[in-house]
UniProtKB/Swiss-Prot annotation:
Encoding gene per record: PANX1
Subcellular location: Cell membrane; Endoplasmic reticulum membrane
Modification sites for Phosphotyrosine: 199
Modified residues (S-nitrosocysteine): 40, 347
This protein's name: Pannexin-1
Amino acid sequence: MAIAHLATEYVFSDFLLKEPTEPKFKGLRLELAVDKMVTCIAVGLPLLLISLAFAQEISIGTQISCFSPSSFSWRQAAFVDSYCWAAVQQKNSLQSESGNLPLWLHKFFPYILLLFAILLYLPPLFWRFAAAPHICSDLKFIMEELDKVYNRAIKAAKSARDLDMRDGACSVPGVTENLRQSLWEVSESHFKYPIVEQYLKTKKNSNNLIIKYISCRLLTLIIILLACIYLGYYFSLSSLSGEFVCSIKSGILRNDSTVPDQFQCKLIAVGIFQLLSVINLVVYVLLAPVVVYTLFVPFRQKTDVLKVYEILPTFDVLHFKSEGYNDLSLYNLFLEENISEVKSYKCLKVLENIKSSGQGIDPMLLLTNLGMIKMDVVDGKTAMSAETREEHGNQTAELQAMNIDGETKANNGEKNARQRLLNSSC
């Protein structure tokens, strides 16, 4: 019995989740995959286009070209270019063929893209500092408790198995039909009011995190729509050239007769900027439905992650179905995102697959039988060693008996020889 008890300890200790020496859940993902994809594209694309715009500026060298008279030196021509480039946002110094054309949009196009990139990074930044720490602590607690629930189930199976071994419950008629019920009645104290279940139920009445999540998604959608409006308007200017007329007669040059009244100028990078605006506009238009989809992701009533824990007793997943928008629906999504960190989920998923294989095998009964198989193997080895020791004992006893018989015969022979010598001497 002691050997069987020790074997049971080894079997169930293999299934218990080991406590790691280093901190658990180091790589928790505190942002949903679809949200992270939206952030990377919405923020990364403008930064990429800005780098291309500045690379084009470095390769060309100047963003404006003005036609100066041949009598001007290169310093005077450079002054005209610089003056007209600085006066792009001043309407009183410019006259365009297309009327009041906002030429400053061309000048500040890279910086406006940078502004949109910064604005689109604000919602994820707010989420990281306002909501992520709270979700991180809650997820660690929930996942640790889920592992503990699994461990308690293994301990309960061990307790039930030990009780059956001590009391001979296996010989009671009808125990096979009621094995699952009696198994958990023995260790009911292990499962009274699982704290993780009660904690998750409280999230159905909480809306703090879901409000922050929806606010971030709405803000992202609004910024993307504003960016699409700006890029669409900028692209509509493609039919208008970047040519304009600039006057530099101001200050000491106002009465200078050698300076022409107007200079014909052209913005060189307009064509490149319009191409970049088309690329950014197309990507943002395709990205907007994805952001709308993220608004409805928490509305999904999915509890697939927790459903596998229905194998364990008293863990009622049906009560975890969220009704509308609440924190519970958000926690379900983040549990699904970090399910690879939960070791008990992997083990229970294997048992669930065995259960759904159609063979009619109860996973917990299979777990108990697995312990019995291990104990049978150990008992078999013990029985074989006992038989071997018995055979060795029998062989030793036979050898000892043979030695005793040999010594007796030798002593009798010596006595007979001495008697014959005495008789002959007489």
